[in-house]
């Protein structure tokens, strides 16, 4: 399964992705995003920790306005 970086405030998303078998990494700083296939951020600050500008190999999913299931589906589609 994929390695997914998730902001700390999105605990429900972290748990759901872990249940699906993904390796979940807490995003505390920009460096935590390196090596992730995909990152999930709140989207409330579009450049949280500089992740929007960093060159990770995966995509960045903004969780704002999405349900946990919708976020998990986007992760599946992008990894």
Curated annotation (Swiss-Prot):
InterPro entries: UPF0180 (IPR005370). Belongs to the UPF0180 family. Pfam families: UPF0180 (PF03698). This is UPF0180 protein BcerKBAB4_1316.
């Amino acid at each position: 399964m994929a390695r997914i970086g998730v902001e700390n405030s999105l605990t429900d998303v972290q748990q759901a992705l872990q249940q699906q078998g993904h390796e979940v990494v807490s995003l505390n700083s920009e460096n935590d995003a390196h090596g992730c296939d995909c990152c999930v951020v709140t989207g409330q600050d579009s450049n949280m920790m500089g992740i929007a500008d960093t060159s990770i190999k995966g995509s960045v999913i903004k969780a704002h306005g999405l349900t946990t299931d919708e976020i998990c589906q986007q992760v599946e589609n992008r990894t």
